[in-house]
């Protein structure tokens, strides 16, 4: 068993009950010696759970917010305190105060982090019978959306059990968000900064149908999905802008070049010229505004054109194939342009996923393992 003396447990809580004592007792029993307990503006009648625990256990350092600021703010308060006051600390592990994280799983996540130096997510199994239907459905949808629109495979996007090494913590403390959306922003920041992570399977515990959770299904879900879909929304705007430029250039070049070319040659020349113009605009919009990538411009541009050139060829061939199939004449400029735009729209979703996962992906800070350790 590994020494956990240089690992701090971050334990945020709002209006706790007696389960908080059980959480603390379990952590101490499993070898944790430093607990950062954060009161996130609890009501007066619940304060004694914090003060009693802090008085009874010298292993606890007690922090508090005068008013409720949200789970994200509570986590960042603890992270900031850890970085300033635990210079020899190797990392932290975040734990929820409702006793739904078994201390054995908490320890397992920490030991895995110490072995690999990676962020470790303790992930529940949502296929089990004891999982509430709304939790099973919500996590499944969020995981699918995350995989498609963010390019990350995370089986439990809302897990509160996260072991974070010190170097990653310095990055994640600066992430925006004060409430439940902070944990989603944390995952997005892990992707943007190339922070390696992996999953460890943990017990799936729901007490009283998760009644003690402070998660607001509509309000907090909206905050989370807004963050996840932001990349794709910006990509759509970038694509529409580039598509308008591309389509206008294709139409103009086709009108000009029709005096010297016809058939496939006309389609190819107009398509290539339009794509050269629009691709430069699209590259810089995507790099700076959509993916906000810090990847090397030269490397990203090389990858971008390794994608864009085959895509352009496929687009031209598909467009010309539709023209031939439907017997569209060279003089039917409006219809030709419409077909070209439709083909371009069909290809852009696949292009988005490749750009996100490869073209503008940051260099990883080590081997990223998204597998599951039992």
Give the location of each predicted region.
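A conserved acidic beta->alpha catalytic loop
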Residues: 39-50, 67, 99-100
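Conserved short acidic donor-positioning loop in nucleotide-sugar-dependent glycosyltransferases
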Residues: 15, 40-42, 69, 78
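Cell-envelope/extracellular polymer assembly enzymes that use nucleotide-activated donors
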Residues: 6-8, 34, 185
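Short, well-formed alpha-helical segments that are part of the catalytic scaffolds
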Residues: 15-29, 45
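Conserved donor nucleotide-binding strand/loop of the catalytic core
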Residues: 51-87
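Acceptor/aglycone-binding surface of glycosyltransferases and processive sugar-polymer synthases
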Residues: 67, 73-82, 103-180, 207-215, ...
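Hydrophobic helical membrane-anchoring modules
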Residues: 1-3, 175-258, 275-279, 286-310, ...
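Short beta-strand-to-loop acidic/aromatic patch adjacent to the donor-nucleotide binding site
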Residues: 88-100
């Amino acid at each position: 068993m590994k020494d956990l003396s240089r690992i701090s447990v971050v334990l945020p809580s709002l209006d706790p009950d007696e389960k908080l004592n059980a959480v603390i007792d379990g952590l101490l029993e499993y070898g944790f010696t430093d607990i950062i307990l954060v009161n996130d503006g609890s009501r007066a009648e619940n304060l004694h759970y914090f003060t009693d625990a802090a008085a009874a256990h010298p292993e606890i350092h007690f922090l508090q917010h005068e008013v409720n600021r949200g789970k994200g703010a509570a986590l960042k308060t603890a992270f900031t305190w850890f970085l300033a006051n635990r210079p020899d600390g190797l990392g932290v592990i975040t734990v929820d105060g409702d006793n739904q994280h078994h201390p054995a799983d908490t320890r397992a996540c920490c030991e895995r982090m110490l072995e690999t130096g990676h962020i470790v997510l303790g992930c529940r199994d949502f296929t089990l019978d004891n999982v509430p239907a709304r939790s099973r459905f919500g996590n499944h949808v969020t995981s699918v959306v995350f995989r498609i629109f963010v390019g990350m495979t995370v089986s439990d996007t809302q897990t509160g059990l996260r072991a974070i090494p010190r170097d990653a913590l310095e990055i994640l403390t600066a992430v925006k968000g004060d409430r439940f959306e902070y944990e989603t922003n944390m995952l997005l920041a892990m992707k943007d900064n190339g922070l390696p992570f992996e999953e460890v399977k943990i017990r799936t515990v729901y007490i009283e149908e998760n009644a003690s959770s402070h998660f607001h299904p509509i309000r907090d879900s909206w905050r989370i999905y807004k963050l996840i879909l932001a990349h794709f929304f910006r990509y759509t705007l970038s694509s529409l802008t580039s598509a308008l430029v591309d389509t206008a250039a294709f139409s103009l070049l086709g009108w000009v070049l029709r005096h010297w070319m016809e058939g496939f040659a006309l389609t190819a020349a107009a398509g290539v010229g339009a794509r050269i113009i629009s691709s430069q605009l699209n590259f810089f919009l995507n790099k700076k505004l959509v993916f906000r990538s810090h990847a090397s411009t030269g490397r990203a541009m090389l990858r971008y054109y390794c994608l864009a050139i085959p895509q352009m060829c496929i687009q031209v061939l598909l467009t010309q194939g539709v023209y031939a199939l439907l017997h569209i004449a060279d003089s039917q400029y409006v219809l030709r342009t419409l077909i070209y735009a439709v083909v371009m729209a069909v290809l852009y979703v696949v292009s988005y996923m490749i750009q996100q996962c490869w073209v503008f992906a940051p260099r990883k800070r080590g081997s990223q393992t998204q597998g599951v350790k039992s």
